[in-house]
C-alpha cells in the first residue's frame, strides 16, 4: 500500500480491527519512510446497486454520498465522526441486505432521516430542509410541528 503522504511503498500495518459487524477490516498503517500514519478499509466486493433518482436517471450507490449528506446535516452539532460513520454504515448495510439491484433515492433519504431523527433533531431538520425541498416557510413549519408532536407522544410513552 502506497503512503498517501510521500508515495513510498514501504508501509506496515500497526493495528487491524473488524468493523461493521465483521463486514469491514480497518487497518491502521504507518509509513516506514516518512512516519506518516493513515487508515485503510477493506470491504468485500459486491454486485453494484443502482440508485434511481427522482428524474429516473440511475447511478451506482455511493456510501460516500450518504456519509457527506449526514456530515453536512451534523455540522457544528454534538455528533461524533464515529456516530456519523456508524449511521452511514448502517444505511449501507440496510441497502445491501435489501437484496435489490435498484433502490430509490427517496428510500435512502428516508433511511437517513430516520437515523438523524433519533440522533439529533437539529441535524434531522437540516437534512429534511434539503431532502424535502420545502416549497415555502409553511411547509418547513409543518415538518417541525410533526417532529414536535412525535416527540410529545414519545415522551408520554416513556
Swiss-Prot record:
Cofactor names: Zn(2+)
Zn-finger region bounds: unnamed: 3-34
Keyword annotations: ATP-binding, DNA-binding, Metal-binding, Nucleotide-binding, Repressor, Transcription, Transcription regulation, Zinc, Zinc-finger
Pfam family, one: ATP-cone
GO molecular function, a single term: ATP binding
Family: Belongs to the NrdR family.
Protein name: Transcriptional repressor NrdR
Organism, as annotated: Kosmotoga olearia (strain ATCC BAA-1733 / DSM 21960 / TBF 19.5.1)
UniProt lineage: Bacteria, Thermotogati, Thermotogota, Thermotogae, Kosmotogales
Gene designation: nrdR
Amino acid at each position: 500500500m502506497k503512503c498517501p503522504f510521500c508515495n513510498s511503498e514501504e508501509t506496515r500495518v500497526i493495528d487491524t480491527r473488524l468493523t461493521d459487524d465483521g463486514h469491514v477490516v480497518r487497518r491502521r498503517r504507518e509509513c516506514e519512510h516518512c512516519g506518516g500514519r493513515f487508515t485503510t478499509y477493506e470491504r468485500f466486493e459486491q454486485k453494484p446497486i443502482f440508485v434511481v433518482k427522482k428524474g429516473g436517471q440511475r447511478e451506482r450507490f455511493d456510501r460516500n454520498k450518504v456519509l457527506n449528506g449526514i456530515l453536512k446535516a451534523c455540522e457544528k452539532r454534538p455528533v461524533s465522526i464515529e456516530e456519523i460513520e456508524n449511521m452511514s454504515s448502517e444505511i449501507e448495510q440496510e441497502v445491501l441486505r435489501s437484496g435489490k439491484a435498484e433502490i430509490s433515492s427517496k428510500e435512502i433519504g428516508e433511511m437517513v432521516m430516520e437515523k438523524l431523527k433519533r440522533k439529533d433533531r437539529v441535524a434531522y431538520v437540516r437534512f429534511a430542509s434539503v431532502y424535502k425541498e420545502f416549497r415555502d416557510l409553511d411547509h418547513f413549519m409543518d415538518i417541525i410541528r410533526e417532529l414536535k408532536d412525535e416527540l410529545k407522544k414519545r415522551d408520554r410513552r416513556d
